[in-house]
């Protein structure tokens, strides 16, 4: 009986660790983006346009799990729309010099309580290669795990 219990716990722990690794790889995949400069008539200057590789395109419209940090956009502790970052607030794209590929817009099913600790979110990944007023990644129908 002890051997069966030990075997079960070993398998459960291995599965948990392998799933955690997969979840953390989402940002790594999303970071494999390149940019090209194009002139924008509305802004009157050249801007960076994202070029999504096949690995990123394969995630478009798919359910993904991402570990990161909530960056509130309103003064509320419970939000349905916010920015999610691969890095803590002081190191994020808006505050610390990381690239735009390290953040995403989040639209959640129900309000998610703010925390400064990292959290896992699951949702449908959308790619944005054309609207300069939005982030390049959006996580729709997100829920906290």
Label each PLM-derived region with a short phrase.
Residues 4-13:
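Sec-dependent N-terminal signal peptides
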Residues 19-145:
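OB-fold and OB-like single-stranded nucleic-acid-recognition modules
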Residues 14-18:
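Sec/Tat signal peptide C-region and signal peptidase I cleavage site
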């Amino acid at each position: 009986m002890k051997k069966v219990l030990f075997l079960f716990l070993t398998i459960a722990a291995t599965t948990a660790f392998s799933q955690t690794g997969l979840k953390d790889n989402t940002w790594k995949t999303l970071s494999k983006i390149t940019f090209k400069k194009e002139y924008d008539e509305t802004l009157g200057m050249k801007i960076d346009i994202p070029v999504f590789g096949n690995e990123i395109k394969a995630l478009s419209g798919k359910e993904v799990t991402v570990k990161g940090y909530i960056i509130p956009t309103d003064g509320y502790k419970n939000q349905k729309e916010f920015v999610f970052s691969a890095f803590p607030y002081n190191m994020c794209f808006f505050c610390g010099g990381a690239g735009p590929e390290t953040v995403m817009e989040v639209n959640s099913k129900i309000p998610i309580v703010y925390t400064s600790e990292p959290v896992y979110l699951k949702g449908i990944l959308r790619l944005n290669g054309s609207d300069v007023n939005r982030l390049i990644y959006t996580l729709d129908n997100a829920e906290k795990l």
